[in-house]
Design a protein with these regions (language model features):
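Accessory cap/linker subdomain of secreted extracellular hydrolases
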Residues: 1-70
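Catalytic metal-binding/acid-base residues of hydrolase active sites
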Residues: 4, 82-83, 113
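Second-shell loop/turn segments in exported
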Residues: 52-58, 76-82, 124-128
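Short beta-strand/loop motif that positions the catalytic acidic residue
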Residues: 71, 77-79, 109
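Conserved alpha/beta-hydrolase "acid-adjacent" motif
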Residues: 82-91
């Protein structure tokens, strides 16, 4: 989950690749610039790229942070630490605190990817040892109390 929207993951990915030395900072700048230009085209009503694809990206890339904070119901967010989409989840409690939101639970599952599979040393998910049952049991237990 990334409350800042899906496009954020691509910006962060280029940055992380540069930080790790996988690409140069100039390459990261170029990648990010292309992402910005493509994203800008989605908001141009005269663009030929303005299609259902663009509409999909606009909806998935819209920040949901304010909506999330404004929810009156309890909020439970679980995420795998190895999911680039989840980087911002570490900061969510700060935003909740600023707005006085206290009915939330944010849980990081270390060394798991987006679908809660462990990551092997080769960097690939271990699909034989998924942790969905752990995540769901934790959520069910939390929801019974909230």
């Amino acid at each position: 989950f990334n409350p800042l929207g899906r496009i954020d993951q691509y910006i962060r990915s280029a940055r992380k690749q540069a930080e790790l030395g996988e690409i140069t900072w100039q390459q990261a700048d170029s990648i990010q610039k292309e992402i910005y230009q493509e994203y800008q085209s989605y908001y141009n009503p005269d663009s030929t790229q303005n299609s259902s694809f663009a509409n999909s990206w606009k909806s998935f890339s819209k920040s949901q942070l304010n909506e999330l904070i404004d929810l009156k119901i309890p909020v439970y967010i679980a995420y795998g630490s190895n999911d680039i989409n989840s980087d911002f989840c570490d900061l969510l409690p700060l935003y909740f605190i600023e707005k006085g939101k206290s009915n939330y639970q944010v849980i990081r599952y270390p060394n798991l990817e987006h679908n809660f599979f462990p990551i092997e040393k080769n960097g690939y998910p271990d699909y034989q040892n998924g942790r969905w049952y752990v995540v769901m049991n934790s959520f069910v237990n939390w929801s019974m109390k909230n």
